[in-house]
Design a protein with these regions (language model features):
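Structural/interface elements that position substrates and couple domains in central-metabolism enzymes
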Residues: 1-457
Length: 457
């Protein structure tokens, strides 16, 4: 997310120097490449590259030129569930060797509470004069696929500062959004905020800001696990989870967002943030059992879907399956903790032959699902579905929601669709002759024709 922040800050009128220790990545960015799939990011980088934003592997030079230094390195989950802060420590140690005058060091990475104090101690350990720095927490609340829009049109900007001097630096940085001036400039990305309704900035303590990030992601993960648990009950009593979620979402106290039943959450944030938040609570002697249940339900949901596939096909050995989707959600190429990848692994171990297609994530998927005798990749979704015994919907890409059902029916061997994302209306699937299995809805929809469409060669 550091690259997104850099592009957006430059669009707000700031000069930004991006630092990465991967020189090949730096060269790629300098040459006009974009290493991640993210809407609007290529356009912003093209607009500001060489003017508002530059790229280097020289951290000391970048720190010397900057008033604020944003840390946006990864904090992966360790074996205990705790966030691994080794990358943070490494970059802070390097920053420390480059500080000669006052700098604001900004935590942008998702970190556990008291990391602010820990960074301060690391800087002290390296001999940095306390009057030469402040450490501020400024958590990001970005969704992959809409990260640029989320940054420029935020629900809130949280600044955890220990004094007014450092808080004022962050206020000035975000002033184009909080004053509304950004939204009046030519070429500004349209969205929820405007000159009349600018972004809101909340100043808190560093500890509060750090917990706001973890608690926010944990609560969103809770909503996802809750609706999936309700979906499993709804399916058992012939109710429809889509109607249930709609009815719940109309309550202004609940709201409709994150009430989508499916395969559970994945990606680089929710899994590790829920685990890290639970670990923090345990370290403080707090029994946060609710977070254990959130994780348990999420893990179970993948097994529930696998069992749906097994139930629909009786046996998986030798079956041809089309897997539509590899990314953990639509509009991204991120496969980290992707339910789709986990489910495909299970299918391969069960002896199924899987042909996968994803609009953006196939190259990344090949790193963890290398081509093999029973694992192939297709150029489009209809090619993936050719002669399939069943089509599995694993990622909620818009392309899949707009599929030509008649064309799909002609491509498959058996008209069976097992939808882990509830992209289709059951009545429409029945009309097109599919056996349709989804999440949290009645299993009564059967194909009008259940025989093979063509002999297998």
């Amino acid at each position: 997310m550091g690259l997104v922040a850099a592009a957006c800050f430059s669009d707000m009128g700031h000069k930004v120097v991006c630092v990465d220790n991967d020189e090949a990545r730096v060269r790629l960015l300098c040459d006009g490449g974009v290493p991640i799939f993210e809407a609007h990011l290529p356009e912003l980088l093209a607009r500001h590259r060489g003017r508002g934003v530059s790229f280097t592997a020289n951290l000391a030079e970048a720190v010397e030129k900057s008033e604020a230094v944003f840390i946006a390195v990864g904090t992966p989950q360790g074996d205990s569930g705790a966030a691994d802060l080794s990358y943070v420590e490494a970059v802070v140690s390097e920053i420390a060797r480059s500080i000669t005058k006052y700098k604001v060091i900004v935590e942008k990475s998702t970190v556990p509470v008291y990391t602010n104090d820990w960074i301060r101690r690391v800087l002290h350990r390296h001999g940095v004069d306390p009057k030469h720095f402040d450490v501020v927490s400024n958590p990001e609340f970005l969704r992959e696929g809409t990260a640029v829009a989320d940054f420029l049109h935020p629900d809130r900007i949280v600044v955890g500062a220990g004094n007014e001097r450092s808080a004022e630096v962050l206020r000035r940085i975000y002033e184009p959004l909080t004053s509304g001036s950004y939204y009046s400039q030519k070429g500004a990305l349209p969205g929820a905020c405007s000159h009349e309704h600018p972004a809101c900035l909340l100043v808190t303590s560093a500890q509060s800001a750090e917990i706001i990030k973890h608690a926010s992601n944990a609560f969103l993960a809770l909503k996802i696990s809750f609706i999936n648990a309700v979906a499993n009950l709804a399916e058992d009593v012939d109710a429809d989870i889509e109607d249930i979620a709609a009815g719940m979402g109309l309550d202004s106290r609940i709201g409709p967002r994150f009430l989508r039943a499916g395969l559970g959450y994945g990606g680089s944030c929710f899994p590790k943030d829920v685990a890290a938040f639970h670990w923090v609570a345990q370290q403080r002697g707090i029994d946060f059992h609710l977070l254990q249940e959130v994780r348990k339900i999420n893990d179970t949901q993948r097994e529930v879907f696998f069992n749906k596939v097994l139930s629909a096909l009786w046996t998986l050995r030798g079956k041809r399956l089309a897997a539509l989707g590899l990314a953990f959600k639509g509009d991204t190429d991120d496969i980290r903790e992707s339910p789709a990848i986990d489910i495909i692994h299970k299918l391969l171990r069960a002896g199924a032959n899987v042909t996968a297609y994803d609009p953006a994530a196939m190259e990344r998927a090949k790193e963890v699902l290398p081509p093999a005798e029973n694992m192939r990749y297709a150029g489009d979704l209809y090619q993936a579905a050719k002669d399939a015994d069943a089509v599995l919907i694993l990622t909620d890409w818009k392309e899949f929601a707009k599929i030509d059902l008649a064309k799909l029916n002609r491509a498959v061997r058996f008209p069976i669709v097992i939808d882990g994302r509830n992209l289709y209306k059951p009545e429409e699937m029945q009309k097109h002759g599919f056996t349709y299995v989804s999440v949290g809805r009645s299993a009564k929809y059967q194909a009008l024709e259940g025989k093979p469409r063509k002999a297998r060669t």
